[in-house]
Every structure is written in C-alpha cells, then in structure tokens.
Amino acid sequence: MYAIIETGGKQVKVEEGQEIYIEKLDAEAGESVNFDKVVLVGGDDVKVGSPYVEGASVTAKVEKHGRGKKIIVFKMKAKKNYRRKQGHRQPYTKVVIEKINA
C-alpha cells in the first residue's frame, strides 16, 4: 500500500517503512507526527481525494533534523565590478513512515 501526502508545499509518495527527507517540521527527534493531507491512497483499490482523501492519514516517526548540502548563489554583472557570493543550506527533517491509515 502506498499514499501520496502533502507536506512542506510538496507532494511525496510514501510507503510503510520508507525513510524520506522533507521540509523541516516543528517536532523533536523520536516524536511521532501525523500527516492528514493525503491526496491519494493506492493499493488494491485506489482512493483519490478532492482535494484530500477523507479519513485517511499517515503516521511517521521523526528520526533526525539536519541541513542539506551547501549551494552557492553567485551574482555578477560583467564590467561593473559587481560580485555577490552567498551560501545556503536548506533545513530538512528525516522521517520514517510507520503506518498508512486509509
């Protein structure tokens, strides 16, 4: 069984036991979180929500928080001596999907 959930402005396909990296959540490591915005539940019979499947939820456990690889944002205007270098690391949360309730 699989589900498509909406979190952090993105849609993610999840299955039980899967580890996923999502946008940072306000939850401590080891805490259990519940995703109510389930767009689709698949398996033997597929349930498609409009916009969300009623009564469906996905339970996950927060494993850790972290920051992604550093990316460099470099702005430059030729012949004008304009240079700006800025780094960015996106925060993320690693969760393990425990149960899909459909």
Curated annotation (Swiss-Prot):
<comment type="function">
    <text>This protein binds to 23S rRNA in the presence of protein L20.</text>
</comment>
<keyword id="KW-0689">Ribosomal protein</keyword>
<keyword id="KW-0687">Ribonucleoprotein</keyword>
<keyword id="KW-0699">rRNA-binding</keyword>
<keyword id="KW-0694">RNA-binding</keyword>
<dbReference type="InterPro" id="IPR001787">
    <property type="entry name" value="Ribosomal_bL21"/>
</dbReference>
<dbReference type="GO" id="GO:0019843">
    <property type="term" value="F:rRNA binding"/>
</dbReference>
<dbReference type="InterPro" id="IPR028909">
    <property type="entry name" value="bL21-like"/>
</dbReference>
<dbReference type="GO" id="GO:0005840">
    <property type="term" value="C:ribosome"/>
</dbReference>
<comment type="subunit">
    <text>Part of the 50S ribosomal subunit. Contacts protein L20.</text>
</comment>
<dbReference type="GO" id="GO:0003735">
    <property type="term" value="F:structural constituent of ribosome"/>
</dbReference>
<dbReference type="GO" id="GO:0005737">
    <property type="term" value="C:cytoplasm"/>
</dbReference>
<dbReference type="InterPro" id="IPR018258">
    <property type="entry name" value="Ribosomal_bL21_CS"/>
</dbReference>
<dbReference type="GO" id="GO:1990904">
    <property type="term" value="C:ribonucleoprotein complex"/>
</dbReference>
<comment type="similarity">
    <text>Belongs to the bacterial ribosomal protein bL21 family.</text>
</comment>
<dbReference type="InterPro" id="IPR036164">
    <property type="entry name" value="bL21-like_sf"/>
</dbReference>
<dbReference type="GO" id="GO:0006412">
    <property type="term" value="P:translation"/>
</dbReference>
<dbReference type="Pfam" id="PF00829">
    <property type="entry name" value="Ribosomal_L21p"/>
</dbReference>
<protein>
    <recommendedName>
        <fullName>Large ribosomal subunit protein bL21</fullName>
    </recommendedName>
</protein>
